[in-house]
Structures are given as C-alpha cells and as structure tokens.
Amino acid sequence: MPPLKRVKRANPYDLYRTCKRWKCPLMSFLKVEGKTVADKYCSMGSMGVYWRLALHGSGRPTQGGYVPLRGGGSSTSLSSRGSGSSTSISRPFAGGIPLETLETVGAFRPGIIEEVAPTLEGVLPDAPAVVTPEAVPVDQGLSGLDVAREVTQESLITFLQPEGPDDIAVLELRPTEHDQTHLISTSTHPNPLFHAPIQQSSIIAETSGSENIFVGGGGVGSTTGEEIELTLFGQPKTSTPEGPINRGRGIFNWFNRTYYTQVPVEDPDEIAAAGSYVFENALYDSKAYKHEQQPWLSRPQDAPEFDFQDAVRLLQGPSGRVGWSRIIRPTSIGTRSGVRVGPLYHLRQSFSTIDEPETIELIPSTVDEEEVLTGVPESAEGPDAEYSDIDLQSIGSDEPLLGTGIIYPLVGGGQIFLCMHRAPVGWSSGTYINHEGQSRDDGEYVIDNGGQSNITPTVVIDGSIALSLEYFRHYYLHPSLLRRKRKRNPIFI
C-alpha cells in the first residue's frame, strides 16, 4: 500500500490560465472573473450607496426663494450656481411694493442712493467737494440768497509782547495737529487670598503696628481673634510603651525559648564583623615598614575572636524604644534542599534595664577649727633663757632645736605669726609673717625691711603662734646671700 501523501491544491488563477483552452468547471471561471453571486450583491450595494450620496449632496435643483437685500439696494441678484446659469430676478415681496417706499419704512435699512453727477475736469482729487466762488453773479431770480465766506487761520506761534516792567514775555505754542487723546483703562481685580492689615487704635507711645508685635508672649495693643486654649501634653514621661506589644507566635516570637536561645549582650553590633579578617594596610601605617620592631608581621595572624563569629546570617529585629535584637544562625549542617540543622540565637540588648548602683567609698573631708596657741617654745622662753650654739656648717643634730611637738620653720625677723594648718587633699598650707620693727630691752633694735635691709638677720623666735586659715607666702632673700657674678672679659685670639 503506497504511503498517504497530501497533495497541494493548485491555485485557481493557475487553473484559469491552464483551462482557458480546455473545459473546466464553471466555478473556477466565475471566481476568477468576479461573476459569482456574492460579487453581484456587492456591486449592486455599492451602486446604491453611491447614487444615494450623490443625490443627497446635490440639493434640490429649483430656482426662486427669498434672497436678502444687498448693500447696494438693488433687487437684481445673480445666482452663483454655475457659470452657465441664467440671471434671475428675486422679488422680496409678493404684493409688489414699490422700491421708493422702502426708505420710509423703519423696519428696513434704507438703500444707498447713488447720485449721478457730471464729472468735472481739471479738479484735483484732493480738492474739496464744495467749491465756493470768489464772486457770486447777481441774478434777479436769486433774491435773498447771500453767499458769505469766513476765512479763519489760527497762528501756530503767538508771541505776547510785554506791556509793563512786571510783565514777562510768553511764547505760546500750539500743536499743528489736533490734540492726541490717549485712552487709559484701569481694571481692578480683588484678590480673595490677600487681606490688608487693619490699623487698629494703638496705645500711647506705640509707634509700630499692633498686629505683629509680641512682647513676653502677649500682643501689644488691642488684639482680635479667637482664643484657643492649648492642651499640655505631659504624659508619658517614659520611653517604655504602656500597652502590651502584640508579639508573634511560634518561630515568629523571638522570645520563645523553644526555637531560640536567649543570649543577653551589651552591644549586638559587635557581631556584625563576623567572618571578616583584620589586617594592617602598609600605605596608612608607618610602623608597618619597621620589621625589626614588629617581627610578627612576617607570619599570618588570626582574626580576633568575637562571640558568635561563625554567624552566617544576621536578621535585624524591630528596633523599638525598649531594646535591640538580632537573630543569628551559626554555620551548621545543611542539606541539598536548603534545610539547615543548628540552633538559633536571639541576641538582645535592653535599653530600659536599670543597673544596680555602684558603691563608691567616699573620703571624709574635715577642717580643723581655728586654734590659737599662746606661749612660746621652751628654747625661747624668757629673756634669761640660754640659747644653744649651733654650727652653721652642721647638717644634723641629735637634739631637736625646738623640742618635740610642732615643727616650726626658722624665719629671720621680729615678731612672727606662724600660720599652719593640716589641710586635706586638695588644700595648700601657707605662712603669714608679720614683719615689724621690735625694740628689745638690751637696746638692740631690729629693723625688718625684707630683702632691702643691709643687716644680716638673726634667728629670733618670739611672740604668739596662731593657727588660722590664712594662705599667704612671703619669701625674701637677703642681698648678702646672693652670689656675686664675675665679669668675664672677652678673649680675642
């Protein structure tokens, strides 16, 4: 059995050319020549549409009808239907009203009557239409007719001569043409969005507007308007929300201990550097070039160890006014389907946590009361007391100079007021020395003039000793104790 094969059908136009000499089905000829029933219906329909549109657009081919009057007042009009059309006369009124009576009818515009006048030769076209002769011939038939001509010529420049000594010459100029009138129009459009300030009566000595001046929160002068009482928002005074927070359930609740391991941290951002390495850039670190100071640069260094540095996924939680949370999943075993096996950690930093107060031991600060000691040390007690001879070259001595007790500095001068105070940390102690001239019983007069005295001071301790809070220091160096400077002569070689 031969295989079934689809044979392509021939084109009707090819069959028409082939069957022109042979007998072929009639349908092929009609289709190619366009003589089928469908072609006939289409031709007849298109013909009807064409004639319908042609007759409708041409209008009614009749004459007559009312034609309005033209500007010339003529009743004869030429129709504009074509160059070969005939002239038609239109009658505006069927009753045959004569044309002369149209001027007396107020409902119609009077026609323009063109007067036929003889053409005057020799008259310029710019000459006036009415010509007045210089002399009018006297005619007996024209009695009572007087023709007069008034010639008035205005001077353009008028010079007024001064008549008296007080007069001033005035030169009056008139324009050559008529006065030029300028038309000026003004239109005013009110703006509903703008309101001019209303000047109100101000108080005495007020020179500025009272609408925009505020002193101390109040308006100066009389103010108008509606007073609106403001509400003070004093609550809440804390950043913690008052109402409960709608938390998720199951794995969406980060505080669920079934799915997450709660880890309180101080700063969750420290774990953001997980998986990064720390190295030094030699371009910005000058010490990196000195290998003798940093021998460890030759070998690789490990990254610093952070908590949860093996986190491969960070989820930033809702940052509210209470705390800050992060969810991390450390590296663990995973399958091809994407399932990860491992714990989830919830890192939480609470902002509203109040820590326990730290106990700080305070150092007591005490100030001694003023204490006045009346009396003198034993070594200077009385005029008959024996003085100890002390070698000035000696550095130390077995016996105390002033006995036991308070140590007083040796100050040369007369009566001494020694002020000492045991001050706490942060205070400074000082001495106040009152230098006064003193006359002793043996006739010796001690002059205390500070560093300007030429007398070598002696070690004299006398008078009362007062302890007070006086902070003054007066130090004088006697000129005899100064080192003399040797003048050096320059040596020229």
UniProtKB/Swiss-Prot annotation:
Pfam family, one: Late_protein_L2
Extent of motif Nuclear localization signal: 1-10, 483-489
Disulfide bond entries: C19-C24
PTM section of the record: Highly phosphorylated.
Any GO MF annotation of the entry: DNA binding
GO cellular component, one term: host cell endosome
Top-rank lineage group of the source organism: Viruses
GO annotation (BP), single: symbiont entry into host cell
Region feature Disordered, mapped onto this chain: 64-89
Family: Belongs to the papillomaviridae L2 protein family.
HAMAP family named among the record's database cross-references: PPV_L2 (MF_04003)
Entry function: Minor protein of the capsid that localizes along the inner surface of the virion, within the central cavities beneath the L1 pentamers. Plays a role in capsid stabilization through interaction with the major capsid protein L1. Once the virion enters the host cell, L2 escorts the genomic DNA into the nucleus by promoting escape from the endosomal compartments and traffic through the host Golgi network.
Name by which UniProt lists this protein: Minor capsid protein L2
Organism listed in the record: Odocoileus virginianus papillomavirus 1
Organism phylogeny: Viruses, Monodnaviria, Shotokuvirae, Cossaviricota, Papovaviricetes
Gene transcribed to yield this protein: L2
